Design a protein with these regions (language model features):
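Thiamine diphosphate
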Residues: 1-102
């Protein structure tokens, strides 16, 4: 079995962190209820741009992913749309225990 792809397929040269920040900037501009909870990664993954553009919609929870999950859950309970961002290895297990308990 064979098939042919139709169209021009080029590799997207943007990296994931820039895509995330661009999407978040767009969402935050369109909806003031969109919140970003950061785990002290503003310089590492370029989310500092979010804090500069929308300081009232950004929370830096520090190096405390479990606490960030609790903050995100609390904000969501008040009607906000929350995106909590951290590295996968730090946002797994213990931090999700916090989300489960919230």
């Amino acid at each position: 079995m064979s098939f042919t792809l139709i169209g021009k397929h080029e590799k997207d040269s943007r990296n994931n962190r820039d895509g995330y920040v661009t999407a978040m900037l767009d969402l935050m501009e369109k909806d003031s209820k969109v919140m970003h909870v950061d785990c002290d990664l503003e310089n590492c993954i370029n989310t500092g741009k979010l804090a500069k553009a929308f300081p009232e919609q950004t929370v830096n929870a520090g190096i405390a992913e479990a606490n960030a999950m609790g903050v995100a859950a609390g904000l969501a309970a008040t009607g906000r749309t929350v995106f909590m961002h951290s590295f996968g290895c730090f946002a797994s297990r213990r931090a999700f225990d916090q989300a489960f308990m919230s």
